[in-house]
Structure formats: structure tokens, C-alpha cells
């Protein structure tokens, strides 16, 4: 069986919206709801679980600086390295309501970087810039089974996967989070097995170590030529996973592997 993603291009547009709601899903994951008239015509596809946007975080409401969209539909990124634009990061679209013009984004709460610290201090009325989506990826929905390896950063996309796949889809997922308090409720069908892995157990684990161990010990029966495997976590862990999976290419079609580096540790 041949399985593949289908990519759909979306016209690029720069928008802004304001925070209208903040909700903590867990001690480490916060949902922020944005709303604004510029979200009219937003390029959200309900069957694209990995669809994402670039969020721009202005230092003040009057200091939102985003690239210009050129006549050919591309973005003018000149000067990005010199700080021409507001700080920006990629984030998964968790939900979009085209009637209410609201956009939900889930943030991992941490002290490093841009998005996490912003989310910790976010308040109603704050403004964000929204760039994209540029294109969306529709995954196959006809695999015999699905295997997932995710962490907090890819948990919003995985939650969308569970909503997109057919209710009868057979799914095995390993989800690495800090501890049991970081679990969140996930909608899913009857044939879904969720394996929560806790870094804080046993004296603490390096990010991604539990996910890689789960992959190493993955039962052979979990893989077939009709399996679709999606992993999204730290870049170095993804590289190790790729090497491991390439050694199993007699069990799973390499074209059915979708491994994405969602973030990278700074050494």
C-alpha cells in the first residue's frame, strides 16, 4: 500500500489578532484564544493536523513588525537576521472558528525562548501577529495502523491528528511529558492506545530519551508496509529515530515515515 501526504498551498497573508481567552490545560500547557476581523478568510483546513502559523510577538502593541507579502505571494524576509521584525516562532493551529473568527494556540510554558515566556505573562487584550499558514499537509487516512511519538511541543498537533483520523483507525501513541500532572484529556476512537511517559519519574530523564527507548522497544507487530509513523520532538532525537527506523526498512516503507524536528536543544 502506498501512503502519502497531500500538500495544499494557501495564499500568504499577514494578520493580527487579540487575546480574548486564556485557559490552562495543564501546569505546562496553556491555550490562548485570539480573535480579530483580520482572521476573515483564514486558510485553515480541518483535515490538516500539522497546519501551523508564524506568530509574531511585539514588545509593545505599537511595535508589531512583520514581513511584507510581495506581489508574487512570497514574503520579504530581508533584514530578519538583523532584527527587522518582531520576534517570531512557529505554532500549530489547534482550532479555528470561522464564524466567531477565533484562533486557538496551545503554548508550552517555559522560561526560555519567545513563545513560552510570552504565554506565561499573556493577558486579555494582548496583540499577536499571525503569518500564514503558507501551505497545509493532508495526511493519509487509509493506513492499516498509525504509530506516534510526541512530546509537549507536538501534543497540540497530535490532538488534531486524533480528531482528523477515522474513528475506527488503529493508533498506538507514546507521549512524553514532565509528569502525570502534564497529561491532558484527548478525544479519540475505540482503537487508540495512549502511552504516557514521564520524564520526572526515576530521577528525571533527558528530553526525548523515553520516546527513543519506546521506539527501540517497539513490537515488530506494530509495523507493516501499511503503517504510517509520525514523530515530532527534539531535533537530535529525531535524527536518532531516523537512523533506527532506516535499519527497519524491511518492516516499514520509508515513504510512510514522517519525522519532524519541532525544536532543538541549545548546547
Predicted regions and their residues:
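Extended, composition-driven regions rather than compact fold-specific motifs
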Residues: 1-267
Amino acid at each position: 500500500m502506498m501512503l502519502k501526504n497531500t500538500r495544499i498551498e494557501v495564499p500568504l497573508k499577514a494578520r493580527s489578532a487579540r487575546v480574548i481567552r486564556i485557559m490552562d490545560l495543564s501546569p505546562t500547557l496553556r491555550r490562548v484564544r485570539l480573535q480579530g476581523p483580520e482572521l476573515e478568510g483564514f486558510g485553515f483546513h480541518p483535515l490538516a493536523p500539522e497546519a501551523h502559523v508564524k506568530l509574531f510577538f511585539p514588545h509593545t502593541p505599537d511595535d508589531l513588525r512583520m514581513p511584507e507579502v510581495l506581489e508574487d505571494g512570497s514574503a520579504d524576509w530581508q533584514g530578519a537576521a538583523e532584527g527587522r521584525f518582531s520576534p517570531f516562532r512557529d505554532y500549530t493551529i489547534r482550532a479555528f472558528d470561522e464564524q466567531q473568527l477565533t484562533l486557538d494556540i496551545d503554548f508550552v510554558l517555559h522560561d526560555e525562548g519567545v513563545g513560552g515566556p510570552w504565554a506565561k505573562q499573556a493577558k486579555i487584550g494582548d496583540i499577536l501577529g499571525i503569518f500564514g499558514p503558507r501551505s497545509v499537509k493532508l495526511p493519509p487516512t487509509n493506513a492499516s495502523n498509525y504509530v506516534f511519538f510526541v512530546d509537549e511541543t507536538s501534543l497540540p498537533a497530535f490532538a488534531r491528528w486524533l480528531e482528523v483520523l477515522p474513528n475506527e483507525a488503529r493508533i498506538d501513541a507514546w507521549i512524553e511529558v514532565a509528569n502525570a500532572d502534564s497529561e491532558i484529556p484527548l478525544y479519540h476512537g475505540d482503537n487508540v492506545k495512549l502511552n504516557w511517559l514521564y520524564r520526572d519519574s526515576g530521577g528525571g530523564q533527558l528530553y526525548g530519551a523515553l520516546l527513543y527507548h519506546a521506539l527501540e522497544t517497539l513490537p515488530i507487530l506494530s509495523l507493516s508496509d501499511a503503517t504510517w509513523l509520525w514523530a515530532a520532538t527534539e531535533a537530535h532525537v529525531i535524527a536518532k529515530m531516523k537512523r533506527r527506523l532506516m535499519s527497519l526498512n524491511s518492516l516499514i516503507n520509508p515513504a510512510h515515515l514522517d519525522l519532524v524536528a519541532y525544536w532543538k536543544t541549545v548546547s
